[in-house]
Amino acid sequence: FERPVGLALVADEETGSRCGLGHLLKHRPDLFNVRDLIVVPDAGNEEGTMIEVAEKSVMWLRFTVKGRACHASTPQKGRNSLYGAARLITALRELESRFDAADPLFHPPVSTFVPTRIEANVPNVNTVPGKDVFYMDCRVLPQVPLESTVAAAREIAAGVTSELGLEVVVEAEHTEAAADPTPADAPVVGALQRAVRRVNGREARAAGIGGGTVASLFRKAGLPAAVWMTARDTAHQANEYCLIGDVLQDAKVFACLFAGGDVLA
């Protein structure tokens, strides 16, 4: 007993997958079938015991803070957009308490709202900036409407701007609503659990994550995908790495799946 194997090498995952799997699913949906065991090796834990079946909604917010530039020696003549941005970043922590629902399926179990990137403003030290732009990465539990989080962010921004005499524009630069999760008893989840048990002698369990993978696109197309690999918790950190031993052990698990060895487990 052996399973036919298909391998999809797709681009653009970090920026929305419009030119990668999204393009493939749109133009060649015949390549995939609801009976396929679709495994995306893009998330996991150090023991190789997490099978990801659900992902949070993703939204990237862009905040443009507008003030009035002036010479730094006469700050009263301007409106400091950097100070406004700093105040707003601090105020936006209120989102955590407004949307504090928890779901134990996910790690972490709550929605997260994290300021990440700030664009350069003035090139010199002696100028009060009149415009600052920063971004916030939001990973929102599926039951929370993204529209409500945008509205809350704008309400918080309005409070800061009215106090400081600034203008703030809040834009959703990227949104990806959560797909329906892969059922924990889906065939692909069971097959992975049996293969992990046979190869590694460990029990793997279904879980959800805040990160985004191409599995979301499969799920939105009605294809129950699972995400699995053995991963050291170093994603997007300095000196990100994986261990060769983990890769070799994962290869054995995939070989077990390919050969149908999980059926005998």
Region locations from a protein language model:
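Acidic/histidine-rich catalytic neighborhood of metal-dependent amide-processing enzymes
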Residues: 1-54, 262-265
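Metal-dependent amide/peptide-bond hydrolase catalytic core
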Residues: 43-48, 53, 59-265
